[in-house]
Amino acid sequence: PVWSFLYRKMIHKLVAKGYRCIAPDLMGMGKSDKPISIKYHIYDTHCDNILTFIKKLKLKKITLFCQDWGSLIGLRIAGENSNLFSGIIAANAEIPNFTEESNPLYIPEPLKINTKIKSFKKAMAYHMLNNNGFNMDIFQVWVTYCITTPFVHISEIMGLSLSRNFKKDQKILDAYTAPFPSFIYMAGPRTLPSMNAGITGQTLKAIDGLKKFKKPFLSLIGLQDKLLGTPRIQNRFIKMVPGAKGQDHEQFKEANHFIQEDIGEIMAERMHKFIVKNKI
């Protein structure tokens, strides 16, 4: 449920080193337009939007830093359009290889708002971030919470998705809720998790492309993130992507799901080091 505010620590450091940094907000998020219909928010639409954005700005030689939905969208685009990219950093990232037959996720039917939901934590979706490993049943709880809650508790979600060592600043947490003045504008954060249920083979071409991606590829994970920050997912990328060979992959004990908020300055330093090392 985040927006480009998440990247402020990284952008500050990288711009100071002379880089051009672009952090687009997905439609329905941040400062972008917010279609109020949940039917607008499907995986293909968001991928098409970002690819159009890249082409409109005529971006080339991109060094991609992607995390969470930034990776489900970004890695698909990079896998299908490798000519636009010079390198990739995948941090707490994933691109699922679901087919119509293998995707276990679903949107609850009939779809109704559950007025009994009073908080993210009480809805038990927090288990998604604190269980002992990736579990599709737990992720389904997250999907159901977002699509049926009468209010997406974004600042609470952020607080539970940051490092145990992170000094929680309520003003910072509230900044993630700020783009959504009322429930009607929350169609984006409500539907992003359930968009996974609509992935039925669209990523397979991109995965094939990533298997042939020989340009530099770096994997960084926050070990407190039990969903995407797992060595299993990191090793999958290292084995799958040819360009991952010889790179300085790292695991950070002090970081959780939103690694850009927890250790954004370190992420910027690693990105700079990656670019310099590989002469991108």
Model-identified regions with their sequence ranges:
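Hydrophobic residues on the short alpha-helix immediately C-terminal to a glycine-rich phosphate/catalytic loop
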Residues: 10, 77, 270-274
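Active-site loop/turn elements of alpha/beta-hydrolase fold enzymes
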Residues: 26, 93, 254
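Glycosyltransferase donor-binding loop in the core domain
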Residues: 2, 225, 256-259
